[in-house]
Amino acid sequence: MNQIRETMESVRKNVQQNRPKTLKAVLFDMDNTLFDFVAVKLIACREILSYLGEGDKNLKKDPAELFRYFLRGTYGFEDYENIKDYMQERKLFTAQAYRQCCEIYDREKLQNLELYPGVRDTLEELKKLGLRLAIITDADRYHAHARLTRVGLLDSFEFLVSADMTGTKKPDPAHFLFALDALGLKPEESLVVGDSIKRDMAPARRLGLKTAYASYGDWRPTEETEQCFDFQLNTFQDLMGYIGTLNSPHVQTDPQNKNQIDP
């Protein structure tokens, strides 16, 4: 642990010397960027099926089967109606069982959340550099606050933009513009970090923000990668190194790998 902290301190000092004066803030997506939200959703789905299966030995216990209901787009990604549809289509619905499944869903999502390695330390180092940190998420304010509180990061961010605040979801530019307006910053003064090329990288880049693609959290890779982001993060800790390269005249972006290389 001491060795890791010493390495982080060394990186921070190097970044402090090279950080571009124009970079003033880092705007983070939340789910699958700070923590693996899909993993806890699947755990919650598994526990729901386990509960329902106690009275039906023939029920398939594949959590992906229930998870697919959340992906349909019929309701929101966290809407209980997805659980209700699943239960009704399998003739498992009762009001009592439904309430219990919703409680299981909320409980398991939160209690199993774990930050990706290095998130807490990296955020602390970014703040030491004087960078302002904010969240831009498609979750609503209630769920965003609950998750950030659970992992102990609620106070790490100066501002949070949620779907119920803007009335839209990414890739609508309103999320990014709302954050910039709240922070009083220009697009070129901010960096966006997110796991979705379509919803985070592409719209942010079109607005003129710098972009860092959190590939480690992208559970639905897309072919839409060409020129859609400035740098690829294979781990969250890679962010410190990228910020350190932004001011270097000897570093350029590899158009194929989107990683920084010396010419």
Locate the predicted segments by residue.
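Asp-based, Mg2+/Mn2+-dependent phosphohydrolase catalytic module
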Residues: 1-26, 39, 120, 124-263
